[in-house]
Amino acid sequence: MFASKLDSIRERCSYRKTILPKYETEILTVLSFYPELDSTRIIFKEATIKASLNARPKVGSLFFRRRKNRTYVIRIKPNTEDSVATLDQAGFNAAVGVLGHELNHVVDYSNRSIFGIIGRLFNYTNKKGKRKYEAEIDRMTIEKGLGWQLFDWEDYVFNKSNAKVKYKAYKKDIYYSPEDLKSLINQGNPKN
């Protein structure tokens, strides 16, 4: 039964997507929450990056394609010895939660002009701007119905992963803690 549901989700959600087979179930599951991205080009790939995951538009598609034809890349850090918290060590729900967070970056970028995206980049030049932007993305994730999955990711990062103290301190400065997420989810209105 699950296989037939996965086939149905794959048929609907994999159009214009490059999906890593290793994370196919998690990626297809989270894509099913984002019908507005059904025709959006998204490449999921492993990459050596400092963060666990990140999402961004492909630079060439910003300049040479219309907004609806842009390509976005979600980069996933593979498990290495110097690793931060990684997707392959998190549970299914945690993986779905953080992938949902990254897809909300894609939703945000897809609704912006090139100048709006550049403005978002400026948010990342200071801690206050970065914190505000990531809080907005987390609230979007909760509004999509993925709050508990995002909670599982943050709980994994802070309490179960082998992430270094420095990485956990960075996460604490920028992102909601598991307790903050639980409070927002229980409020039922993440805009408060």
PLM segments and residue spans:
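Active-site scaffold of zinc-dependent metalloenzymes
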Residues: N54-N93, Y109-S110
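Post-HEXXH active-site segment of zinc metalloproteases
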Residues: N93, D108-D138
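Short alpha-helical functional segments enriched in proximate histidine and acidic residues
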Residues: E102-V106, M140
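A metal-dependent hydrolase signature that marks the N-terminal structural subdomain at the beginning
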Residues: M1-R65, K191-N192
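Short alpha-helical catalytic segment bearing the HExxH-like zincin motif
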Residues: A94-E102
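Stable alpha-helical elements in mature extracytoplasmic
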Residues: Y23-E26, A95, Y133
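Metalloprotease/metallohydrolase-associated module, dominated by Zn2+-dependent proteases
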Residues: Y124-N192
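Short, flexible/disordered intra-domain loops and linkers
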Residues: S14, A85-A90, L121-N126
